[in-house]
Amino acid sequence: MKTTVFILMMLLSGVVSAQQKPTTGYAPVNGLKMYYEIHGSGEPVVLLHGAFMTITSNWTAPWGNGTTNWIAELSKTRKVIAVEMQGHGRTADIDRDISPENLADDVSALLDHLKIPSADIIGYSLGGGAAMQCAIRHPEKVRKVVIISFAFRSDGWVKEKNDAMPKITAEAFKGSPIETEYKKLSPTPDKFADFVNHLKASAVKPYDFGADKFKATKAPMFFIFGDADGVRLEHMSEMFRLKGGDVSGDLGPRSESRLAILPGMTHVALMFRGQTIIPMINEFLDAKSSKQ
């Protein structure tokens, strides 16, 4: 557990922003004032960050050392809508579970607020769960989905990962960039411990999105994992099979969904690899449907 927190601290220690000034706002959605930023122009894509993260810490190259600014790269050809989900960053917490289902409903309401009929969605970790639920609960709003490191059932994670979450405390983040950024951005800067406990209480609940519901989703999905991710390898392949994977594309039609497993990558370290992942994402999002 201490190792995970240390890695997160190191990753967040060089927060930088070389962004051109975006359009920003707060959307009234489901009892939230949800903070969002819009960068660039083109086909819309929504970015959903991971637990304890913000737009800056997840997407705008916070780690320095030449790592890729996801928003800068994606907004070269797309309208990027980056949000801060319930309790994170500039979006205050409210009295409800911080669950993928609730977060997905917020994304749907945000798109309504912005008068965007549908969008591609990229979600990392907790944001990946919200992206999955967008495809399940709001299929009319979703074109394609990129899921970076999430499982659609609790048992899709390795035991060590499930065992670690209940042990997270606000004290573990004391003095860290995660705590510092929360206190800098949050409308309730003195509520960091409450936020950690609330997020933990939501995250430790067993969940199952349902294989049948997952299989029935219409949106093509691109699953991206590290080979030391914390998601079980069997679960990665199960998700891909549910979306039509595990075929010989040389001998017949292949799935419009995709799977990538990056070597030598952990759950956290995946976000170092934007220079590898973003071109694959762009290719996936730009690919024409075989049904067109």
Regions found by a protein language model. Name each.
Residues T217, F223-F225:
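Short beta-strand/loop motif that positions the catalytic acidic residue
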Residues S255-Q292:
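Catalytic active-site module of serine/aspartate enzymes centered on a nucleophile-bearing elbow/loop
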Residues E101-A119:
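Conserved acidic catalytic loop of the alpha/beta-hydrolase fold
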Residues L32-R90:
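Conserved HGGG/HGGXW glycine-rich cap/lid loop of the alpha/beta-hydrolase fold
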Residues A119, G123-S125:
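Conserved alpha/beta-hydrolase "nucleophile elbow" surrounding the catalytic nucleophile
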Residues D227-M265, R273:
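Conserved loop-alpha-helix segment in the C-terminal half of the alpha/beta-hydrolase fold
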Residues G129-R137, R143-E179:
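Flexible "cap/lid" loop of the alpha/beta hydrolase fold
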